[in-house]
């Protein structure tokens, strides 16, 4: 009987720990985009993108919103990125670069995932706050304007992953 109680306690502790571990995660909008290239190569591609298309850089007037989304302690395998879109609707995407070599020892792939969208207020919109049409519009815009250019710069195959 004691083993049964110990098993219940252990299961409860595991459930509590997994809930606490998920507290600082935001989820993601759509699937992550996997580039079959190294993190260094994708970082260089991002630098080229911002150099050739400076309009995607976060404007100073939008920098005040950064602190309301980037509260979580930095992870050794993610890096925060922001992409600004001036055209209608004006939006700022909070995206993370996920370094798979740190997590899986696979240095030949790196992922980008949209975590949240801001439309000019202190409130960031997470996936749970979007209807299907809005989510699809965000994903299409990111794919058409950002991913397509990064694919060319990295010369790599790009796949979608959940």
Where are each of the predicted segments found?
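C-terminal motif of bacterial Sec signal peptides marking the signal peptidase cleavage site
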Residues: 19-22
């Amino acid at each position: 009987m004691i083993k049964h109680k110990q098993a219940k306690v252990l299961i409860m502790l595991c459930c509590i720990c997994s809930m606490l571990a998920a507290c600082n995660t935001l989820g993601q909008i759509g699937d992550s985009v996997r580039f079959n290239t190294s993190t260094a190569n994708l970082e260089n591609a991002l630098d080229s993108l911002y150099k050739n298309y400076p309009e995607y850089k976060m404007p100073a007037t939008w920098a005040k919103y950064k602190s309301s989304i980037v509260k979580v302690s930095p992870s050794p395998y993610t890096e925060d990125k922001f992409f600004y879109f001036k055209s209608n609707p004006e939006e700022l995407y909070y995206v993370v670069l996920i370094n798979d070599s740190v997590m899986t020892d696979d240095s030949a792939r790196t992922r980008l995932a949209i975590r949240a969208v801001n439309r000019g207020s202190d409130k960031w919109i997470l996936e749970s706050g979007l209807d299907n049409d809005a989510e699809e519009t965000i994903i299409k815009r990111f794919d058409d304007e950002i991913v397509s250019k990064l694919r060319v710069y990295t010369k790599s195959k790009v796949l979608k992953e959940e």
